[in-house]
Amino acid sequence: MVFFELLLFQKVKFKKILLIDIEKTDTQNHGFNQNGSGYANLINTKSFLVNNGIKSEVIKVCNPEVQKLPKFKFDLLISLFSMGFHYPCDSYLNYIIENSSDKSKVIYDKRKNIKDTGHEKLQMTFKKIKKLSKLKHDRISMIKEKNK
């Protein structure tokens, strides 16, 4: 769900918010797989945020199975229990690199003991700020620096 994001959005008044999610797939995968599965509803998620005080006009939604990911320069990207946890970071690697700028931050959950070349490539572009270790994953926080 989007409870963490709601608390963040209420505290920090972002000018642009992009929600990306696959809304429906034939299968629902609950471990780590090469492809992500979807069972979200972006319209309901946006409505939840709007009903809790986030302005509708700042929120864009995108289902990458239905539409092309928009160009969207970001300051902060959050992927909790999704990219890196259920599927490889490779899925969004190029998008993240192309749409980040100096000082962009990325926070995501990396499943332990799983090889993920996208995660390794992100570490070449971003500097790790913090890692919080959990039982099955590490929560990774990184920042993009010049010339990295």
Which sequence ranges carry the predicted segments?
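Conserved S-adenosyl-L-methionine
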Residues: 10-17, 22, 33, 102
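Conserved beta-strand signature within the Rossmann-like core of class I S-adenosyl-L-methionine
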Residues: 18, 102-113
